[in-house]
């Protein structure tokens, strides 16, 4: 009975939704991830925009009311 594995293909670590650079300037929060990734956005991004360079520099244009956890491994959280 692992019905949860049918919907989602196994994701690689790099495609999991995460955001190291997230900005919010309002209340309620409007957060937008400003991370730049090569050739694609994270798996939960609905609106992804990439440059036409090779490799493409892609950023997610979604505006949410939360930020994903940082992409870096935990332990680097103290640095601002």
Swiss-Prot record:
Keyword Methyltransferase tagged: no
Site-annotated residues for Reactive bond for trypsin: 25-26
Bias (Acidic residues): 1-10
Matches recorded under InterPro entries: Bowman-Birk_prot_inh (IPR035995), Prot_inh_BBI (IPR000877)
UniProt site positions, description: Reactive bond for chymotrypsin: 52-53
SUPFAM superfamilies found in the cross-reference section: Bowman-Birk inhibitor, BBI
Disulfide-bond pairs as recorded: 18-71, 19-33, 22-67, 23-31, 41-48, 45-60, 50-58
SMART domains for the chain: BowB (SM00269)
Keywords: Disulfide bond, Protease inhibitor, Serine protease inhibitor
One of the Pfam families matching this protein, by short name: Bowman-Birk_leg
Compositionally biased spans, kind Low complexity: 15-29
A single GO cellular-component term on record: extracellular region
Region annotation Disordered: where it falls in the sequence: 1-29
Family membership: Belongs to the Bowman-Birk serine protease inhibitor family.
Protein name: Bowman-Birk type proteinase inhibitor DE-4
């Amino acid at each position: 009975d692992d019905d949860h594995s049918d919907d989602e293909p196994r994701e690689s670590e790099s495609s999991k939704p995460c955001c190291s650079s997230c900005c919010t300037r309002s209340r309620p929060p409007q957060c937008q991830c400003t991370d730049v990734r090569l050739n694609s956005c994270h798996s939960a991004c609905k609106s992804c925009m990439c440059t036409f360079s090779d490799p493409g520099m892609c950023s997610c244009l979604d505006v949410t009311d939360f930020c994903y956890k940082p992409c870096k491994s935990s332990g680097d959280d103290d640095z601002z």
